[in-house]
């Protein structure tokens, strides 16, 4: 059954022809108490006119948009965020800091409990930040989807991983759309932030919302796409000062999304539609993906040619135009670069019936790098008259990027797997990772990054690491990041 607040909203919709924007908003707000509580309320006949809503009834779009824009401007709007992970939690905090009341939804009860107890589930977000938001009374977390009915804007920040055959897995997005359709009410703004292929917002999310709710995009509610641009650990660019791209299903949807994000971000960029916004995100990540693959392949043949690629990049980067520096490494990791370009490749193959060769080649090269690292490790051990089987190998930094705890798609894991398969006695050190497993096997944690080993491999140059001390103490050091020089240091 639709929650009471949604019923209130539908009755207000029926009354809309005789109500002004302010009165319409007020009728909706009569169905609210404080944030976090949905109430059943009796509907007074004195304010509900004797009209019934027919299937072809349409409330003027200006009324809906005008009321919503005012709520955003005055910060009276309640914001709902679905998914409180690396994207949803920072977005929730940014909206709360902008003056909005935020209801965060997640299916993980432990995460919700942590947030409501002022504990941060993410290492790069301090507990104090969560505590302050909760203390101010404008941030709460829940596992109850009915509480999203009170939200004026609902932002979807759920994972979009790859399936077993590296095909797009939209199950989290689809589950969220089904859930929101049950609480969707007129006047709401729904925004998908999860990275996906062009057309998902219009072809997947829209029909699921419309069919189950009986409401229509652009008439009853707004639907848009706005790609997340979170860079965990980046202290220079955060949610506030990173430009926000928005694209709606209709122009009014774009305006509604732009109005909300304009209160949260310094700069809003309007795309022509949701499809252009979806493509913009994939373009950003595909650009990085193929350029990282370029320098990774160059690193392999530069080693064979005896050329210091890092020095070549340093020199090339002095050109003030037409060049952007990318650097080789042990592979690509994180929630974007290894995943997102595959969504675009899938879309091209599925609809146009031909491959996106740049992406597929880049994927092949970047996926090859962990194996190349292990081959270089074996080569270095051989020069020291040691076999990989039985050699003590220490991995430094197992997260996907420096100075954060995020291990998603980290190349450290496939590297470790290959080292174990060759018989290496493996240990690791990472200031952000207290315990680490590979295929269910616990890997011993070294007491210090300078612990003695037959071979030390630097995978992430965390700022906490004293790289000079590591170089001075290592018997053999394979530097996959080009950060260290020394007699016992060998580049990728």
Provide a role label for each language-model segment.
Residues 5, 11-13, 19:
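Leucine-biased recognition of intrinsically disordered, low-complexity hydrophobic segments
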Residues 5, 24-28, 42:
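Coiled-coil-like amphipathic alpha-helices with heptad-repeat character
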Residues 16-19, 26-30, 99, 423:
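Generic alpha-helical structural signal
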Residues 6, 14, 33-36, 485:
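General helical structural elements
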Residues 39-492:
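Structural/interface elements that position substrates and couple domains in central-metabolism enzymes
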Residues 10, 23-37:
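Short, low-complexity, charge-dense intrinsically disordered segments
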């Amino acid at each position: 059954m639709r929650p009471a607040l949604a019923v209130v909203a539908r009755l207000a919709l029926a009354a809309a022809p005789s109500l002004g924007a302010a009165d319409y908003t007020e009728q909706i707000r009569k169905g609210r108490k404080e944030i976090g509580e949905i109430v059943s309320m009796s509907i007074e006949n004195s304010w509900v006119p004797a009209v019934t809503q027919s299937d072809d009834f349409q409330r003027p779009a200006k009324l809906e948009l005008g009321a919503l824009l005012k709520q955003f401007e005055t910060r009276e709007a309640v914001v709902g965020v679905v998914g409180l992970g690396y994207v949803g939690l920072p977005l929730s905090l940014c909206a709360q800091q902008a003056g909005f009341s935020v209801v965060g939804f997640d299916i993980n009860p432990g995460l919700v409990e942590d947030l409501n107890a002022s504990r941060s589930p993410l290492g790069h977000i301090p507990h104090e930040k969560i505590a302050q938001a909760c203390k101010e009374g404008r941030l709460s977390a829940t596992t109850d989807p009915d509480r999203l009915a009170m939200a004026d804007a609902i932002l979807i920040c759920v994972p979009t991983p790859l399936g077993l055959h590296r095909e797009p897995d939209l199950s989290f997005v689809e589950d969220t759309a089904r859930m929101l359709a049950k609480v969707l009410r007129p006047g709401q703004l729904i925004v998908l932030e999860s990275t996906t292929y062009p057309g998902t917002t219009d072809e997947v999310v829209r029909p699921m919302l419309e069919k189950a709710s009986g409401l229509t995009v652009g008439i009853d509610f707004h639907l848009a796409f706005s790609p997340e641009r979170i860079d965990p650990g980046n202290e220079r660019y955060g949610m506030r000062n990173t430009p926000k791209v928005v694209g709606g299903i209709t122009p009014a949807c774009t305006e509604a999304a732009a109005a909300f994000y304009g209160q949260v971000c310094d700069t809003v960029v309007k795309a022509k539609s949701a499809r252009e916004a979806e493509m913009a995100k994939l373009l950003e990540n595909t650009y990085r993906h193929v350029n990282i693959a370029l320098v990774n392949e160059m690193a392999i043949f530069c080693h064979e040619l005896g050329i210091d690629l890092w020095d070549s990049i340093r020199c090339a980067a002095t050109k003030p135009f037409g060049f952007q520096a990318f650097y080789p490494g042990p592979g690509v990791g994180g929630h974007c670069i290894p995943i997102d370009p595959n969504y675009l490749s899938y879309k091209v193959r599925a609809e146009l019936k031909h491959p996106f060769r740049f992406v597929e080649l880049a994927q092949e090269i970047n996926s090859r790098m962990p194996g190349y690292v292990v081959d270089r490790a074996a080569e270095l051990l051989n020069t020291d008259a040691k076999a990989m089987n039985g050699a003590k190998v220490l991995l430094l930094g197992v997260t996907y990027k420096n100075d954060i705890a995020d291990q998603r798609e980290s190349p450290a894991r496939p590297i470790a797997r290959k080292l174990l398969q060759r018989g290496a006695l493996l240990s690791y050190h990472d200031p952000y990772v207290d315990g680490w497993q590979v295929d269910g096997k616990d890997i011993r944690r070294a007491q210090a990054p300078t612990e003695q080993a037959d071979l030390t491999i630097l995978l992430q140059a965390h700022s906490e690491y004293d790289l000079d001390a590591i170089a001075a103490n290592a018997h053999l050091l394979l530097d996959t990041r080009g950060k260290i020089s020394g007699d016992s240091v060998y580049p990728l």
